[in-house]
Amino acid sequence: EDAKQAKDDFMANISHEIRTPLNSIIGIGSELLDAKVDDTTKEQLYDITVAGRNLMSLVSDILDFSELENDTMELVEEPYNITSVINDVVNMAHVWNKEKNLEIIVDCEADIPNNLLGDSQKIYRIILNLINNAIKFTDAGGVILFVGARKESYGINLMVKVKDTGIGMSEKNIDALENTYNQVDTTRDRRAGGIGLGLAISRKMIAKMNGHMHIESVPDAGTTVSIIIPQRVLTDMPLVSVRDAGDKKIIFY
């Protein structure tokens, strides 16, 4: 028990130590993006900034793994803008997709309330993990991100579906995701450069938020991951749909 606690403390401490220089890299990169530089330099700065955020996401995965294993993860309920969350995910997907040049389609229902109450960072991380996984294991074809909502007495069920035309998974590999730290298929993950945390951590995070994940997959044909997460709606604010969210537009392409 003491050894396990020491390991968990080490993981938490080292993760926090890594965050400090990463935040500096991301912050400086973001500031330089606003400076007057040529297009090539701006693109390089953008790639550095996004790569830093990507690495920060990996560090967060390590922290999440530790918190989930020890049942110490806390949810932060705060107002957030679902449009901003989806835009941030799509911006990251652009970077991941540069080399593969897959077709990425974003399909958002028009009547999703934009003023939600929940843990926006975890919602972002979950959707980001799904997109990352889809791009990582797809070499040809494309990825579709669907976002919708269904009204409930407590607010809405946020519905997200990510469908890809990638290498797929067997039923055995899908079942293996119940184990938080499981690479699903060592050869498969090594080929894609992953460590196998994304889907498994997302599933446990979704369960903690009283939601659920469903995976349908056919080897060599593709995978569809569907999630439903209950979210409250801020009824004391004007209801703004995703499609009418002012200057913060969802990116469709």
Where are these regions (language model features)?
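Glycine-rich ATP-binding loops of the HATPase_c
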Residues: 210-216
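Coiled-coil phosphoacceptor/dimerization helix of two-component systems
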Residues: 28, 53-65, 85
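Helix-loop junction within the histidine kinase core
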Residues: 66-77
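Primarily the dimerization/phosphotransfer
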Residues: 1-34, 53
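Conserved catalytic submotifs in the C-terminal HATPase_c
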Residues: 76-81, 98, 103-114
